[in-house]
Structure formats: structure tokens, C-alpha cells
Amino acid sequence: MDELENLDDQMALLTGMPESVVVWQIEAMLSAPAGVILSTMALLDNWARGDRAGLNRLLSAEEDPAALAGCPDEAGYTAYMQAMYGDRDTAFARQAADYLDAGTRVFFAVGAAHVLGDGGVADQLAEMGYTVETVGAQGAE
């Protein structure tokens, strides 16, 4: 088994978000717990149906300027999101390409937010010339 990143990498990322943004996110989640549950259920439903467009809509909602309403540090939040998704997606895509180029047969897993979306692992691999097929619980698209 090989890791894409280790616990230290993840902890450094998670503790790198400005504290004011962490508090803002927690308060937002606690003020609308039903919304958190509904968005998680929608994410799972779209994945189960193999609905890539639906997943992209849900995942891109975090980047909507309206989602930043009340954020105490928009620049800090934007930098954190770039580190959380953009930078990691690029690293994951490179690692996947290395496995593919080596002819290594592996089970390669990352979270849905890293696979899909503009600049996600699937897009980056396609841009590198690989054939990318999205598979949900119901099978291939």
C-alpha cells in the first residue's frame, strides 16, 4: 500500500487555515445543521447515480462568492481552498500519471471533491492525454 499523503501532510493543511475562518465555518455549520446533512445526502445521491454534472454543481458551490458572505478573511480562505483542492489535485494527478506511466496496476482513491470539478484529478489526467472514465455506484457514465 502506498499513500498519496500522510497524516502530517493533512494535519499541516488543516491547521494552516486562519483561525477566524475555522470559527466562521464551524459557526455556519452549527447554525444550519440540516443544510449540512442535506448537502451530504445530495453528494452521495449524485455519486450513486454517477451524475458528474450534479456532483460538479455541488462541489463548486463552495467557490460561489455568495458562500463567502460573512467570511472574516476571504484571502485566507481562498489560499486555504487552493491548498486544500488545487495544489493537492495537481499532486494527486501527477502521482496517478506516474503509476499509469509505470504500468503499475493500483487501486487509486481520492475523495469526490478531488476527482471532479474544474481542475480536478480527472480533468488533469484527461489534459495529460489519458482516457478518464467516471464510475459511480451504478456503473460507468
Q: What is each residue range found by the language model?
A:
Residues M1-D101, Q138:
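Hydrophobic, often amphipathic alpha-helical segments used for membrane interaction and targeting
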Residues T78-E141:
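C-terminal soluble interaction/assembly domains
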